[in-house]
């Protein structure tokens, strides 16, 4: 069976931690492909200011262009309305029903995961993978959440440690506003694109 993963995010901007997570997932889950999906209009970030979708899409495209096992999809940014994860996963599952799908997202989603639209269907469609920038030290809240989901949905959440790179898009945006160096946080072409387009000032 072919294994593929969807790595969703706002990618505002994409940075080396995103790339590192994708490479880690390739090896750990024996993936043929990781599909980066820039978020369109996620319901949990509806009131947050975001860089226009076509600009975020272009940054992701530049970041992954040399890796043949990485691809990008504009499914969410071209879809109307709110970008629900269920709709995205359903779209890819219907396109490739025989593929074993993984969905990769950050640890912050754990706190509201059970409130996601059609979460039970999401667990049926894919293997759920959560990564943490801080590393997984059997935190009490994570243990409780794992048990709760296992009991309620009979599904095991997979975890990845992404603590090797302490980077966040928020941190990068703030450093740019403060006039600090950020080139070492992202692929060179993304950094040059940000400078050329005067982003995050």
Curated annotation (Swiss-Prot):
KW Protein biosynthesis (keyword) present: no
Enzyme class: transferase
Matching Pfam families: CTP_transf_like
Domain of life: Bacteria
Protein's UniProt keywords contain ATP-binding: yes
Enzyme Commission number(s) from the entry: 2.7.7.18
CDD domains, sorted: NMNAT
Gene3D superfamilies: HUPs (3.40.50.620)
Keyword tags: ATP-binding, NAD, Nucleotide-binding, Nucleotidyltransferase, Pyridine nucleotide biosynthesis, Transferase
Pathway involvement of the protein, from the record: Cofactor biosynthesis; NAD(+) biosynthesis; deamido-NAD(+) from nicotinate D-ribonucleotide: step 1/1
A GO term for molecular function: nicotinate-nucleotide adenylyltransferase activity
PANTHER family: NICOTINATE-NUCLEOTIDE ADENYLYLTRANSFERASE-RELATED, PHOSPHOPANTETHEINE ADENYLYLTRANSFERASE
HAMAP family assigned to the protein according to its UniProt record, in alphabetical order: NaMN_adenylyltr (MF_00244)
Function: Catalyzes the reversible adenylation of nicotinate mononucleotide (NaMN) to nicotinic acid adenine dinucleotide (NaAD).
Family membership: Belongs to the NadD family.
The protein's name in its UniProt record: Probable nicotinate-nucleotide adenylyltransferase
The organism of origin for this protein: Clostridium botulinum (strain Langeland / NCTC 10281 / Type F)
Lineage summary: Bacteria, Bacillati, Bacillota, Clostridia, Eubacteriales
